[in-house]
Amino acid sequence: MNFISKISLGAKVFYAESLEKLLSNMSVAKPTIMTAVPRFYQNLYTKILLSFSKQKGFKKKLIENTILIGKKNLNKEKLSFKQKIINFLCEILVRRKIKNQFGGKLKAFVSGGGALDKQIGEFLNSIGLPTLQGYGLTETSPVVSCNIPGKIKIETVGPPFKTNEVKISEDGEILVKGENIMLGYWKMKKETDNIIKNGWLHTGDIGEFTKDGNLKITDRKKEIIVNLGGDNISQSKIENLLCLYEKIKQS
C-alpha cells in the first residue's frame, strides 16, 4: 500500500541494491525523499564519522564548525556575525558536497520503525542531510505523525497528521483514532477487540506530547523493566546508546 500510494501521487519509487551501493544508486535516482529504519542511519553516521576523522588541518576545522553551527541552526539558536560567515563557507565547502553525494535533490531522510538516537539525528541535520522522525504502524496505514522540514524536533516524531486523532491514556500508552485505522485483523476477532477499544487503537507504545504539540515516543509498553526498587528502566535507551559503538551492530 505504501508503494502504491506514492505512485498514485506521481512519484517514482527506487530501492537501493545494498548499503555498499547506496551512493551510486542515489546518484542515479536523485531522490527527494528517502525512508529507512534507524539502523541504516546508525551505519551511515558511523561511516561519515570515520571519513571525517581522517581529515586534518583546515578541512578538520571546517568540518567541526559545520557540525557545531549546524546544530545551532537546527535548534534555532541565534548566530553571531562571525558564525554566519563561517556557516556560509560551511554550506558551500562541506554541506553542498555532501548533498551532491546523495543525488543533490534530497529534501529529507525519514526514519521510522524504531527510535532514532538524538545524537545521530542532530549530526545528520548539521551536515546538510535533513533527517526527520516519523511514527506509524501497519494498523494505522501506516503513518500517524512526522516531523516537518524546517520545524524539526529530533527527539520527537512530529505532530499527528490531520487524518487521525491521538491521545495518551492514563498509563501513558499512545492511542490513535481516525480514518486510517484498520478495520481489524482478518478472521481474528479476539485479537482485534484487544487492540481496538471504542474506536481507539492501542499502539503498545508509551509516549507524551511536548509543549509545541509534537508527539514523543518514550518506550514500548512491554519493554519497560521494573526493578526491585520500583524504578522503570527503558531497554531501548540503553540499546540505542550501545549501537553508537562501531563494533556493535545490534543490541
Locations of regions flagged by a protein language model:
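Hydrophobic alpha-helical segments in the ANL/AMP-binding
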Residues: 1-9, 120-122, 143-147
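Active-site glycine-centered loops adjacent to acidic/histidine catalytic or metal-binding residues
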Residues: 113, 136, 158, 205
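Conserved AMP-binding/adenylation subdomain of ANL enzymes
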Residues: 1-95, 105
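C-terminal boundary motif of the adenylate-forming
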Residues: 206, 245-251
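Active-site loops of AMP-binding adenylate-forming
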Residues: 116, 125-130, 137-155, 188-191
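Conserved ATP-binding/catalytic segment of the ANL
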Residues: 160-227
